[in-house]
Amino acid sequence: MEALKNLSLTTGTSIMEILFPTIKILAPHLQKNRNAILSVPRSTHTYGSHPRQTLDLYPSSTASSTSPILIFFYGGGLTRGDKILEVPILDKLVYHNLGSFFSKQGITTIIPDYRRVDSETGGEGAIYPSGGEDVSAVLHWLSKTDLLDGKGNKREVYLMGNSAGGLHIATYLLEPRFLEERKSWQGEANVSLKGAVEVGVPFSFEEALAGRNDMLEKYYGSDKDILARCPYGLLKAVGESKKSREELGIPRLLVMNSEYDPVDEILNPNDAFVKLGEKIWEEKIEVVKIEGHNHISPPMALSTGEGEEWGEKAAAWIKINS
């Protein structure tokens, strides 16, 4: 989208600086496609005991009982975000637009709310590793529900995390405390965890803006804890274990980042994470550059008819690996 390119030229790539201008650019495109977006129904379900642990389910437009399942964790800097954003100009279309998009690609889509770090905007007192626990709770709910398929067929599941949502997926995939559970999804369970897509994820925080310090301390702990518990730190510990990706129950990864993502907070940490992962596992990690997008725009562009190529690539990757 030319408007996003122009925004990067005039405003730069800083996430907070581009947030509302990006919403203003994309809102009219979403509203224009409102009927098509809402043509895919969503139902809301509870996946845990905390009031925040609810999820929206968007059934595949094809065969829901056999389709792959995508679980999407949205971004929001660990302190914000909802499965339906309450931003008036967006008219409750985000993230229904994402659920609708992947549904029409033949992929049943689940979008959970998760616990957030306390801030001036609210929060549920989230403290590490609550994000990984919420990922775990969604997978357990999925393994037990008969909403999608009462016949007990094995379902192939993919995780997708955008920005802070990707931190929670990385916690689940790399934290030793979830090891046995991850391995169970590779075995005889009716849920098979096949892959994870990380979109614009800050895999480490050495170059994070100073304004994030309070949030990082509340969630991760001390400076030492932040280094150890961020995805890069967890991956480093994985390397020291000398175990293969398969032995650790870690599925295939697809790493995506945007052309106009900030270099300091996103692109540099992405490069370092991918290089370390490839060194540890001695295999290539697929990386996709999302052309023409900034940090905020990829999920919001889906179902607008423009800038959807990244979603098509993610859907194709899911289908190839299924």
Predicted regions and their residues:
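N-terminal cap/lid segment of alpha/beta-hydrolase-fold proteins
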Residues: 7-65
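Structural cue for short, hydrophobic secondary-structure segments
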Residues: 72-75, 111, 255
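Catalytic nucleophile-loop/oxyanion-hole region of alpha/beta-hydrolase
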Residues: 88-94, 98-101, 105-155
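Primarily recognizes the serine-hydrolase "nucleophile elbow" in alpha/beta-hydrolase
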Residues: 137-211
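Short beta-strand/loop motif that positions the catalytic acidic residue
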Residues: 249, 254-258
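C-terminal catalytic histidine-bearing segment of alpha/beta-hydrolase fold enzymes
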Residues: 256, 263-274, 278-322
